[in-house]
């Protein structure tokens, strides 16, 4: 694997199964080719009026607005520099963590990572692979309660990342045996991608 951007988004820190799975997966990546961003330990700003205004401004930016644009540019450059994104995406209340959504809101920028054309939206970040490690307390894969998979597939595709693999660690709150099997299944899937 060449250049890797690993995103951790769990609020559980050292107790996070998604973080552990991602950390185990990237342990053999050359450190010079690895960027790790812990979105919970180092939270990004929420998309509010001030952030949205900054990202749409074209001139005469205040110092605060320029800081938002600079942060967004840095996050986008991390994506562009990577060949593979490894995303820890635990399911919280049937969706992704706020921390991961904040990252998405800062990298999905019209005219920068996607553009509108007469034929629809065109993603501008191409040639990347994304591996999404999603952990869940219950069993949600291929069911109406799984909003993580379709959302991330759509939003990553929106910016041009269409080669997306999902790794599922499910049933983590359904007893020790079920949790152990869920982790083991995810580890086996990840081992085939290393």
Swiss-Prot record:
The keyword Cytoplasm does not apply. Binds 1 FMN per subunit. One of its GO terms (molecular function) is FMN binding. It holds the Pfam family Flavodoxin_2. Gene3D superfamilies: 3.40.50.360. FMN binds at residues 10, 16-18, 91-94, 135-138. The keyword Metal-binding does not apply. Keywords: Flavoprotein, FMN, NAD, Oxidoreductase. It catalyses: 2 a quinone + NADH + H(+) = 2 a 1,4-benzosemiquinone + NAD(+); N,N-dimethyl-1,4-phenylenediamine + anthranilate + 2 NAD(+) = 2-(4-dimethylaminophenyl)diazenylbenzoate + 2 NADH + 2 H(+). It comes from the Bacteria. Its EC number is 1.6.5.-, 1.7.1.17. It is an enzyme of class 1 (oxidoreductase). Its cofactor is FMN. Belongs to the azoreductase type 1 family. Quinone reductase that provides resistance to thiol-specific stress caused by electrophilic quinones. Homodimer. This is FMN-dependent NADH:quinone oxidoreductase. It comes from Vibrio parahaemolyticus serotype O3:K6 (strain RIMD 2210633).
